[in-house]
Amino acid sequence: ENEDQKYIDAIKSDVNWLGYSWDEERYASDYFQQLYEWSLKLINEDKAYVDSQTSEEIADQKGTPKEPGKNSPFRNRTIEENTTLFRQMKEGKVEPGKHVLRAKIDMSSPNMLMRDPVIYRVLNASHPRTKNDWVIFPMYDWTHGESDYIEQISHSLCTLEFKPHRELYDWFLDQVVDEDKIRPKQREFARLNLSHTITSKRKLLFLVENNICLLYTSDAADDPAS
């Protein structure tokens, strides 16, 4: 629901302002169909299931870093039932929040991100590119590595807070990778912090939305330091 064409346009404007261009535009939404088909593959291999619990119930069962989580009561649904329910989600026959699709990994993993993460949810929202073609949307971790693989990216560079995600990134790739193609690798680095300024997108958005500062545009000035 946070997707908006203005953010896409702002990125393009910033790249142009820096004096660069690009050969090809790529969007994760271009891969929605492939991601959906891979999700059906996971279900068919009994590696994903439709969970009908509320988000609060799912969170309560996740456990803690020191305590294992608990299996969902829907974890052992049959492949046939999961396939039917997931197709109903895609066809818009399910209200938001009623079902989610989760990967079936390990609820006792010391890495809490591996405890049956949600990979699809229902959302009745118009997407800036796909419009209303899709009512199910893939979660970040499912989209990340798979998009890198589709684009044949060799290395995905992330800041250090994504280090715990690497195990999940690799698990998802294990399910779809072809040995004849490039297998992406996630690598992390320390984020650059600048003194006496703010670079956090969340904090900058707060400042702009509350009229504490103005949104800079290339029409306003040519020097961002001015």
Q: What kind of region is each of these model predictions?
A:
Residues 1, 9, 27, 44-186, ...:
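Active-site cores that bind ATP or allylic diphosphates and position pyrophosphate for catalysis
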Residues 4:
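A charged helix-plus-loop insertion that forms the helical arch/lid used to bind
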Residues 7-14, 38-41, 168:
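Alpha-helical scaffold elements adjacent to nucleotide-binding pockets in ATP/GTP-utilizing enzyme cores
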Residues 12-27:
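A glycine-rich helix N-cap at a beta->alpha junction
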Residues 15, 42, 173, 207-208:
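Hydrophobic alpha-helix position signal
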Residues 30-33:
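Short beta->alpha linker loops
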Residues 216-226:
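Single conserved hydrophobic/aromatic residue that forms the stacking wall/gate
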